[in-house]
Amino acid sequence: MTDRKFFIFLLFCFSILFISLFYKSFNSPILYFPDYNQLNYFINLDDIDQYLYDDESFDCTEFSNLFVKRFADKGFFSCTAELNLLSNNKSFGHIIVAVYTLDKGLFYVEPQTDMIISDKDLILNTNYCNLVSWSCNWTIKKVSSCFGVSY
């Protein structure tokens, strides 16, 4: 192979590599951590809390997954968080959303009510219902999300 053909071959290979990297960088979403105002702004505009809860087709998991998807569509990272709760000596789970804000740290969102809960308030052995203004008694036994686990 002559030097000229080799140079053209290398140029072709690098062009393909560059185009594939360039294409990938613009077609893979990059998600950012929001600040608290961006989180609050999103919650005020979004209508997820207006959906009707249904045990069979739209429960806490669907509320939370829809929040995470729509928040990502706006360019922000969040993840679901599982709460292990206790009520009347029965254990059960509940799914909410965890969001790390750049300026104020970790928060949790109850997407059914749009309540924003500080990680300092979502502590073990407290009544979750008091945090979201529901009339029930669900004692928090564990909080698990992509940001960490509390037992």
Identify the function of each model-found stretch:
Residues 3-151:
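A structural boundary/capping signal
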